[in-house]
Amino acid sequence: MSREKPSVLIFSEMFPKPKSSSSGVFIVERLKALGNLGLPFDFAPVSTFDSLPIRILKKLKGYSPSVPIESVQVNQKHYPVLNVSLGLRDRIGLIKQEPSSWMKYAQGMASAIEKNKNIEEYRLIHAHRVFPEGYAAMRLSQKYSIPYIVTAHGGEIHSLSYDFHTLVREILRNASRAIFVSNALMKDACEKLGYDKSNGIVIPNGVDTNVFKPMDKEEARRKLSLPLDKKIVGFVGNLIEVKGADRLPAIARELLKLRSDVFFFIVGDGPLLKTLREKMPGDISHFAGRLEYGLMPMAMNSIDVLVVPSRNEGFPATILEARACGAWVIGTEAGGVAEAIDSDGIGGIVGEDIEKSLSEAINSSLEKGLHLASSTRRSKIPSWEDTIEEEAKVYWGCME
């Protein structure tokens, strides 16, 4: 087979954007590792950009408007972003989670890819997310008789509207293989959607341990203007309820009952920002907003503990990033949180008073002064190379 001609067409709406360089970075990291492995592929980043009315509406709802981007760079190559044109009503419909608007978006993805790519050149289509990307992949597969696979990342399974249950089950069943980033997510698909997992496989996210690695904690804190004499609890993610951001004030209050030397470093943006600023107790927190992805290794090195109070998750890459930098991780039972934490923290925390339980676990880890920078522990953390080696096996199996 010619190495110059791509065999696999990979596409997704998730990729780094100007105001959110961490968004979809797990897709780009996969592509980098795939390129290093030598398997020929093409990438189609797809998106719909915000008009002026949509930018205003997003700001009113506490969301950051998107900024148009022309291409996504992977290694030394630039892949043009394919724009899905939607009317104002449907753009508002996406924000309001209206099923008809999301179906138009999914159909628009298929049309944009078909218009800009010679589909018949490929031997396999890989959609990252079961919906809406997976629906576009299924349509293209049926039209061109090319197999497709999907990767379920989380939200399209655990937070899926009931209106899409039948459709998403169909997308999963018709795929040559359905990849899930955690065992918990595949179990959720089985229980929630009636998926039979006959074509399912679990391949977790990885982390670049050459980038996320231990560095001097004091230096990291100085550069980020964080206190040197405190135990720092980090939160990284969108400031929304599904990520458990609303639980942070109660966690902080409970933790202050146990110790006075704590400080919260909150990285992320979202509709709960104003509320969190008002409710976090005292002067014990710093809201960093969205950090450039290049600063994330420093951020992870600045903290003692990462707290993951999520209500739903797939397989949080932030947990692996924190572990690779030597931080302890405390999290709920949501999705693949416990799988991602492994033995480098405490996962699976449940209970009616979840905030108190999380604060007690945080305090316990701080009391022990745990730091996980040893090479033995870091060697157990999955890398992107590990992830892609498994995905490549799936590719070849589907193209035989």
Enumerate the language-model features and the residues they cover.
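Conserved donor-binding/catalytic core segment of Leloir-type glycosyltransferases
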Residues: L9, P227-K243, P249-A252
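Carbohydrate-associated surface elements
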Residues: A184, G206
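Nucleotide-activated donor-binding/catalytic signature segment of Leloir-type glycosyltransferases, i.e.
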Residues: K274-L291
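Short alpha-helical donor nucleotide-sugar binding micro-motif in glycosyltransferases
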Residues: R290, M298-I303
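Aromatic "clamp/platform" in nucleotide-sugar-dependent glycosyltransferases that forms part
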Residues: R311
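Short hydrophobic beta-strand element within catalytic cores of glycosyltransferases
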Residues: W328-G331
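Conserved acidic donor-binding segment of nucleotide-sugar-dependent glycosyltransferases
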Residues: S343-E355, S364-G369
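A charged, aromatic-enriched C-terminal amphipathic alpha-helix characteristic of glycosyltransferases
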Residues: L370-M399
